[in-house]
Amino acid sequence: MYVTGNLAGNTIAMVLAGGKGERLAPLTLRRPKPGVAFGGKYKIIDFVLSNMFNSGIKKVYILTQYRAYSLMKHIRESWGKWAGLGEFFVAISPETSSESEEWFKGTADAINHYLRFIESSDADYVAIFGGDHIYRMDVSQMIGYHRRNRADITIAALEVPVEEARRFGVFCVDDDNRVTAFEEKPANPVTIPGRETCFASMGNYIFSTRRLIEVLQEGKKLHADLDFGKHVIPMMLAKKDRVFAYNFNDNLIPGMKPEERGYWKDVGTIDSYYEANMELIHVSPQLNLYNYKWPILTNQGNYPPAKTVFDEDGRRGMNIDSYVCAGCITSGSVVRRSIVGPLTKVNSYSLVEDSILFENVNVGRNVKIRRAIIDKNITIPDGTTIGYDHGEDRRRGYTVTESGIVVVSPAE
């Protein structure tokens, strides 16, 4: 644990991890968005769970839903080790829980399904966070802000330019950052007082426990598809509850450099996902995964180190400007500006450039791959070329984005 305090210890967390992530298809055809690999060895959900753990919050329920099996397996293997001494990271799903056999109809409805876990706790605060974004955050600082303001709900907010704000739910705030109005995807976003930027919701909330229970019980009588953005926040504003915005740019973590402040990625499309991964291999990326004072935790696997083999002209194993995970073998081939997941092998005379290879990919001999994403457990036959002729890529059934990223995934 890297940040401690009674506030974090008096908090339980509910992480919403059931989203389909349809814009990220085909990577989400067999897994939910939080279960998609990121940075080679991680899953997207590892970022929010690491934030909770490093912030001192170790009572965490992960609410899964869509194609939940692989995500639940990952959570058991990566996070189950923290069980005991009143600490837990546990995944629950309508498919596996006797609490409810119905699927969630909205973000707040998901919490309502498991409200008894909150009611039976002695927590003063409940952190409700999404499980499908990439960022670092000390949640205990947001809890402290919530307490100082005697808030009923505090909403994590991105400070974004006006032109970007139209894609988000946007707050109107007073000089104390108390929320006075909220509008989903406004045509004319209202700026923060004294600034030329807007507050956009990150979909992350801190609630005072008693008020959360009350508002969810009230809301479920009115809306079967109860949602925080559409229903709960407007209800609380109408009742004059103390609703505050917490500026994410004010959040500081140990080891953070100034240029890292405010880093947050949605990775909701193939292109944005690809770009966020490729940024990691820059010399000085905005998201520095080598900050050991705030580690991103995951299941390491009992894999041997990565290695390169062969050192002959035309057959020299090389990894250049790349992330290459444990268990990988670059055998007489070249990997350049790429991210290579665990247990992947790139065989002789092949070239992989500007690409993302998931776990256990087998790249045959004399293969050329450029600006592509290769899904887990796929074998690329000898002599295959990917990313050089998009017409041919499409004919083979691969997905090709507008920017030219080729995605090779298993057939449904």
Swiss-Prot record:
Keywords: ATP-binding, Carbohydrate metabolism, Glycogen biosynthesis, Glycogen metabolism, Nucleotide-binding, Nucleotidyltransferase, Transferase. Its EC number is 2.7.7.27. NCBIfam families: glgC (TIGR02091), PRK00725.1 (NF001947), PRK00844.1 (NF002023). GO terms for molecular function: ATP binding; glucose-1-phosphate adenylyltransferase activity. This is Glucose-1-phosphate adenylyltransferase. Involved in the biosynthesis of ADP-glucose, a building block required for the elongation reactions to produce glycogen. Catalyzes the reaction between ATP and alpha-D-glucose 1-phosphate (G1P) to produce pyrophosphate and ADP-Glc. Pathway: Glycan biosynthesis; glycogen biosynthesis. Belongs to the bacterial/plant glucose-1-phosphate adenylyltransferase family. GO terms for biological process: glycogen biosynthetic process. It comes from Geobacter metallireducens (strain ATCC 53774 / DSM 7210 / GS-15). Alpha-D-glucose 1-phosphate binds at G169, E184, K185, S201. Transmembrane segments: none annotated. It is an enzyme of class 2 (transferase). It catalyses: alpha-D-glucose 1-phosphate + ATP + H(+) = ADP-alpha-D-glucose + diphosphate. Homotetramer.
